[in-house]
């Protein structure tokens, strides 16, 4: 018994010492020998992604990163393997010349890796094809065609501002512009305003913030992302449940918009003259777009994921 007790104590001691030594080795490596060790940044950020998760959950991430750049300069290490830069010359290197050498990271998987849209798509080949599907929707000619719908929402906003000015009522200018942007995006993407400006009702805004916060916070911890996706929906914590509820609401709205638009186009002849008569919006352009090589159109699932991304 004495021998077993001694072995048990030694095993526990060995485990504790091994764990401590491993952690110490990891910290020393991250701080002094990692390829990003030469770049400045917070100590905790250099050893764990949980630092960034905390920044997102407390809604401080953009402000903290700005402060860090003011303190350290154009390059800041904000994660064990993450580097932030404000260097203008890096933009073309990363986004234009980087291409396949600098693909999107696992962070984007949090935005829907099971069936990703053009925003979260990490496969460069598929991403390139999808961008070609959508190219017309972001052309100058298309934007000019949509000016009438922009003008419509501008008129609503101008009328509200004029009313506030005549009555002397105090109002939130930032919120007024936010409402305008939301309704305009609805017109551009789905040919329908969300009616936020007219109703002056913030609850009509799609709960995009909830989805974005959930994706950012979980995507910031890529090593645990599969487990987080699996188990977080089961956690009985109301603020967390609210985030998942917001994500589901956005997905349901995207699906509904796609179904309604497909129904509207169901009886339209598939010829250039008939299609030209249809009201233009980003979703319709995507529905009618064909694969540049095969001529195939996107599936309903593809359309729903892209509509989800429009929000």
Residue ranges of predicted features:
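N-terminal membrane-proximal hinge/A-helix region immediately C-terminal to the signal-anchor transmembrane segment
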Residues: 2-129, 144, 151-160, 180, ...
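Short, histidine-centered active-site or binding-site loop motifs used for metal coordination
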Residues: 51, 138, 290
């Amino acid at each position: 018994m004495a021998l077993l007790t001694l072995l048990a104590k030694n095993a526990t001691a060995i485990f504790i010492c091994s764990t401590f030594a491993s952690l110490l080795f990891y910290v020393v490596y991250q701080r002094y020998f990692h390829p990003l060790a030469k770049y400045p940044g917070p100590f905790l950020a250099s050893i764990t992604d949980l630092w960034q998760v905390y920044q997102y959950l407390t809604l401080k991430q953009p402000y903290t990163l700005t402060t860090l750049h003011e303190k350290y300069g154009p390059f800041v290490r904000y994660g064990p393997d993450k580097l932030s830069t404000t260097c203008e010359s890096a933009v073309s290197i990363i986004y234009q010349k980087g291409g396949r050498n600098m693909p999107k990271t696992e962070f984007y998987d949090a935005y829907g890796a099971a069936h990703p849209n053009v925003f979260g798509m990490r496969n460069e080949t598929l991403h390139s094809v999808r961008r070609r599907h959508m190219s017309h929707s972001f052309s100058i000619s298309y934007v000019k065609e949509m000016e009438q719908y922009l003008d419509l929402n501008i008129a609503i906003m101008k009328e509200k501002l004029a009313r506030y000015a005549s009555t002397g009522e105090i109002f939130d200018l930032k919120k007024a512009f936010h409402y305008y942007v939301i309704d305009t995006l609805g017109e551009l993407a789905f040919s329908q305003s969300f009616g936020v400006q007219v109703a002056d009702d913030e609850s009509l805004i799609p709960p995009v913030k909830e989805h974005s916060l959930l994706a950012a916070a979980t995507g910031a911890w890529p090593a645990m992302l599969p487990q987080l996706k699996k188990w977080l929906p089961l956690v009985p914590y109301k603020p967390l449940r609210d985030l998942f509820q917001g994500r589901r609401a956005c997905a349901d709205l995207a699906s509904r918009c796609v179904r309604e638009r497909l129904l509207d186009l169901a009886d339209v002849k598939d010829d250039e003259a008939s299609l030209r008569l249809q009201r233009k919006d980003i979703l319709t352009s995507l529905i009618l777009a064909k694969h540049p090589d095969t001529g195939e159109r996107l599936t309903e699932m593809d359309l729903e994921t892209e509509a989800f991304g429009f929000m």
